[in-house]
């Protein structure tokens, strides 16, 4: 009785020990050897069960040191291990790649069975040493199916697929009976070789030997068909599996994802949950990828919660898929929380975050994460580089991009097509076109994305003809253009190349891509910007006519939302087209129609309509749009804010304009330019200069537009020295070559300060021909400062060479002659104007009262209250006449005088 109780106690202790040891090793808390020896001393016994269990756990968890200590204790204790125990010990050494120790154990084994040989073959196969594996295989006295499977798997893992096929053929010749694992391996070979026909032959063998109901073989079959883009066969195999397990469910869900049948993947996942098949690591990863691609944040979040409960959340593959899901569902906040709370982060986790922040246009955060990745010692790969190049493009970080491309060259990853494509895109967006073309030129292999990247780079940098040339080169290289190609090439045609655009439209129709939503929007944009609004509206109406669609309510809702987004882009293009044609009223009417149709405007719509309000000085409508912007919480957008600043200033409301400027959370050079331009336009030169100086202090780099505004402010104030300082600052401090508008402002500054001849010299020193604006500016200042008749005549002659029908040139010169008392020349000019049938451009004024726009032209009697208006103007003119020296209208015919004064 006492002996029985002792044995029972010892058995319970062994079970307890085994359980504790499993927990410690599985949680990476590898116990010290004393834990093992203390137990043996307590039970005062060593057995096959103890050592085999320890060796199995050490092999499973890679605890090599504990395995070695247990091996030493086994020798010291004098325990004579069985073949089974020694096979378990072999597994410890082969799993940890310690083949010296493994060979010693194998050589000293008194009795080897087929399992012993298989352990050595499998170990060498996994270590990419197929020579040694083959040597052991050939020396085996007896081989079983496991031995052959190890060789099959080894050759596959080492990329020697043809060798795997040879082994499979030899198995058949030797009469070895195939099992499910054999078929699983050889079908993986078919997938690797992309040889679906061979896979179908293997399928025939599977059916013939009766393995078609084997879940392992069937799962491999459906995986092979899915990867070979024959999903119908894959689905048929799945439906034929009598008892589906987590492996088969995982294979079919992964197949759906591989074939972009993402909704079906989610459907299978829900069905799997109903039958309680159990969720594996690969299922979590596949379904999370589907959620990411479909922006299914709600389901993705639920799956993450499920993973947390089942302890799968700590798995590296599942964690990376979860991070990627949150990032692609625009939820970087939860992605960052998961990232920060994760232990043992791997490179894939960093890649998911870098890519996510790059896609969310948080370039600086992505760059910081890449720096952390570099510091972590995990290294980088092609995905890391592609993501960080996008980040460099976002922040216009050319210097960072150059350094990172240096890393790509050093690591030979610059040869990767995806990395090269990302680098081309980055250089293009950073305006380093030469570098972009160099990377493109050095590529050994180019795909459609490579051509799209270099074409887009040239289009973004205003190289329209080069873009068209590259498009032709792409076609000659037999690369089929896609929606991204046509998007870039049609943008290149918006600069006036309508003929090319129409030819490309024909190519689009022939290629069958006219129904593509992205291409349709690009066509609408191209025709709108080329001034062919009617053609753009035709395409818009034809493209977005209602179509009969079917699907679930959820799918229909998504399709509807996507279509509304596409329609918004299309409407934006047409509205922008009207603005470019200076038809702001039509643009506003189109915006009203858009709202009536229930299409939600985006920030680009609001910005464009605010531009029309600025053009028409429609402060009322502008304020209504501003209210909508606040309601949709878009006021923090830098683009919207800049447009609001510009709109209020052009409507004469400098107070609200400055208020919007100061409230702006982020100001770029456009915001600063809008405010400075507003002050300059309203003659507030001092405020404009103060704001410009503040802009410099805040390290905002001014551009050409900034200097146009600040020079205009100097012209208003007559600040010749300050104007010259800013003019020379452009090239000296910022590398900006002055353009025609800058010279025009300098002519105005010099002329208004009385230095008319110096202004003429500046025009002659210009590196390019003066335009009509500059000559008209010079002629205008001649009317202010007398005794500059010769300069005025030269300016008039230049203006008439540019446009012989320019009536303003005659009018201004007439005023110069009148101021100089040269009445005969005034009369001659008036006769010439009548002889050439030239008429003064009628003056035009407008005012907005109670949301209604009133427009007035000289001599206009179309307004319903024109009689009251003319009566009031007559009273004002009669009060002005006694104080007017009439020098302005000398030389004008008497019957025209009153009409001129009503302008």
UniProtKB/Swiss-Prot annotation:
GO biological process terms, semicolon-separated: cytidine to uridine editing; mitochondrial mRNA modification; mRNA processing
Chief subcellular location equals mitochondrion
Q: What happens when the gene is disrupted?
A: Retarded growth, reduced size of leaves and length of petioles.
What GO terms are given for molecular function? RNA binding
Q: Where is this region: Type E motif?
A: 774-850
GO cellular component, as recorded: mitochondrion
Q: Where is the transit peptide?
A: 1-31
The places in or outside the cell where this protein is found are: Mitochondrion
What keywords were assigned to this record?
Answer: Mitochondrion, mRNA processing, Repeat, Transit peptide
Q: Which InterPro entries match?
A: E_motif, Pentatricopeptide_rpt, PPR_At4g14850-like_plant, TPR-like_helical_dom_sf
Q: Which Pfam families match?
A: E_motif, PPR, PPR_2
Q: Where are the PPR repeats?
A: 47-81, 82-112, 113-143, 144-178, 179-213, 214-244, 245-279, 280-314, 346-380, 381-415, 416-446, 447-481, 482-515, 516-550, 567-601, 602-636, 637-667, 668-702, 703-738, 739-769
Instruction: Outline the segment boundaries, as ranges, of region: Type E(+) motif.
Output: 851-881
Q: Which family, according to the similarity comment?
A: Belongs to the PPR family. PCMP-E subfamily.
Q: How does it assemble?
A: Interacts with MORF1/RIP8.
The cross-references to PANTHER family, in alphabetical order and at most eight, read: PENTATRICOPEPTIDE REPEAT-CONTAINING PROTEIN, REPEAT (PPR) SUPERFAMILY PROTEIN, PUTATIVE-RELATED
Its function? Involved in C-to-U editing of mitochondrial RNA. Required for RNA editing at 8 sites in 6 different mRNAs in mitochondria.
Name it: Pentatricopeptide repeat-containing protein At3g02330, mitochondrial
Native species? Arabidopsis thaliana
**Source organism phylogeny:** Eukaryota, Viridiplantae, Streptophyta, Embryophyta, Tracheophyta
The UniProt gene name for this protein comes to PCMP-E90
């Amino acid at each position: 009785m006492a002996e029985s109780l002792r044995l029972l106690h010892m058995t319970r202790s062994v079970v307890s020990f085994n359980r504790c040891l499993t927990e410690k090793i599985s949680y990476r808390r590898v116990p010290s050897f004393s834990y093992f020896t203390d137990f043996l001393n307590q039970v005062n016994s060593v057995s096959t069960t103890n050592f085999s269990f320890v060796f199995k756990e050490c092999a499973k968890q890679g605890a090599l040191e504990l395995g070695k200590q247990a091996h030493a204790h086994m020798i010291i204790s004098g325990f004579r291990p069985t073949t089974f125990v020694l096979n378990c010990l072999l597994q410890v050494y082969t799993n940890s790649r310690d083949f010296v120790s493994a060979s010693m154990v194998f050589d000293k084994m008194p009795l080897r069975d087929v399992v012993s040989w298989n352990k050595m073959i499998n170990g060498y196969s996994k270590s990419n040493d197929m020579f040694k594996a083959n040597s052991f295989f050939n020396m085996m006295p007896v081989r079983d199916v496991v031995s052959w499977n190890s060789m099959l798997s080894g050759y596959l893992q080492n990329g020697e697929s043809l060798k795997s096929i040879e082994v499979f053929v030899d198995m058949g010749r030797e009469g070895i009976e195939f099992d499910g694992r054999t078929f699983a391996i050889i079908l993986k070979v078919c997938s690797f070789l992309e040889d679906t026909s061979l896979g179908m032959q293997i399928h025939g063998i599977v059916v013939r030997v009766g393995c078609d109901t084997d879940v392992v073989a069937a799962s491999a079959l459906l995986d092979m068909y899915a990867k070979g883009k024959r999903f119908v066969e894959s689905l048929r195999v799945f439906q034929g599996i009598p008892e589906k397990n987590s492996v088969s469910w995982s294979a079919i869900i992964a197949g759906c994802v591989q074939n972009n049948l993402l909704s079906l993947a989610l459907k299978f996942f829900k069905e799997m949950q109903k039958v309680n098949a159990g969720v594996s690591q690969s299922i979590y990863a596949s379904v999370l990828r589907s959620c990411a691609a479909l922006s299914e944040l709600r389901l993705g979040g639920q799956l993450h919660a499920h993973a947390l409960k089942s302890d799968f959340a700590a798995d590296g593959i599942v964690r990376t898929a979860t991070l990627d899901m949150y990032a692609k569902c625009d939820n970087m906040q939860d992605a960052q929380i998961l990232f920060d709370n994760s232990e043992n982060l791997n490179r894939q986790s960093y890649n998911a975050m870098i890519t996510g922040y790059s896609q969310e246009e948080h370039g600086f955060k992505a760059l910081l994460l890449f720096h952390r990745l570099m510091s972590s010692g995990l290294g980088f790969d092609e995905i890391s580089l592609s993501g960080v190049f996008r980040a460099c493009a976002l922040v216009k970080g050319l210097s960072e991009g150059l350094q990172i491309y240096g890393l790509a060259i050093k690591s030979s990853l610059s040869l990767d097509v995806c990395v090269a494509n990302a680098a081309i895109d980055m250089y293009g967006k950073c305006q380093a076109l030469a570098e972009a073309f160099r990377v493109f030129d050095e590529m050994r292999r180019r795909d459609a994305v490579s051509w799209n990247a270099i074409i887009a780079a040239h289009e973004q940098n205003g190289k329209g003809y080069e873009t068209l040339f590259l498009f032709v080169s792409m076609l000659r290289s037999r690369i089929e253009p896609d929606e991204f190609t046509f998007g870039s090439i049609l943008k290149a045609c918006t600069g006036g190349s309508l003929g090319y655009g129409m030819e490309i439209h024909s190519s689009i129709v022939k290629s069958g891509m006219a129904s593509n939503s992205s291409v349709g929007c690009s066509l609408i944009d191209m025709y709108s910007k080329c001034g062919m609004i009617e053609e753009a509206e035709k395409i818009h109406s034809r493209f977005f006519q209602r179509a009969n669609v079917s699907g679930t309510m959820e799918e229909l809702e998504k399709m509807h939302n996507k279509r509304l987004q596409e329609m918004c882009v299309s409407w934006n293009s047409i509205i922008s087209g009207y603005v470019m044609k200076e038809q702001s009223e039509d643009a506003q009417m189109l915006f009203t129609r858009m709202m009536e149709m229930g299409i939600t405007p985006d920030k680009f719509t609001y910005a464009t309509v605010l531009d029309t309000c600025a053009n028409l000085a429609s402060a009322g409508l502008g304020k209504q749009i501003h209210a909508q912007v606040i309601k949709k919480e878009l006021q923090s957008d830098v683009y919207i804010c800049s447009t609001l600043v510009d709109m209020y200033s052009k409507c004469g409301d400098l107070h609200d304009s400055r208020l919007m400027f100061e409230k702006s959370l982020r100001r770029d050079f456009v915001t600063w330019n809008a405010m400075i331009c507003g002050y300059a336009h309203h003659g507030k030169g001092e405020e404009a200069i103060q704001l410009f100086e503040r802009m410099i202090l805040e390290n905002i780099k001014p551009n050409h537009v900034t200097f146009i505004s600040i020079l205009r402010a100097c012209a208003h104030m007559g600040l010749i020295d300050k104007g010259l300082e800013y003019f020379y600052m452009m090239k000296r401090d910022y590398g900006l070559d002055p353009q025609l508008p800058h010279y025009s402002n300098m002519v105005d500054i010099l002329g208004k300060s009385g230095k008319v001849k110096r202004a003429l010299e500046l025009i002659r020193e210009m590196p390019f021909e003066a335009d009509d604006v500059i000559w008209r500016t010079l002629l205008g200042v001649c009317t202010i400062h007398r005794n500059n008749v010769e300069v005025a005549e030269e300016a008039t002659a230049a203006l008439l060479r540019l446009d012989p029908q320019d009536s303003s040139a005659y009018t201004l010169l007439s005023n110069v002659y009148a101021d100089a008392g040269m009445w005969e020349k005034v009369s001659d000019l008036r006769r010439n104007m009548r002889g050439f049938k030239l008429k003064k451009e009628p003056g035009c004024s407008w005012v907005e009262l109670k949301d209604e726009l009133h427009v007035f032209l000289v001599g206009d009697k179309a307004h319903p209250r024109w009689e009251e208006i003319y009566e009031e103007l007559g009273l004002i003119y009669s009060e002005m006449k006694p104080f007017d020296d009439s020098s302005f209208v000398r030389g004008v015919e008497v019957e025209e005088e009153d009409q001129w004064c009503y302008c």
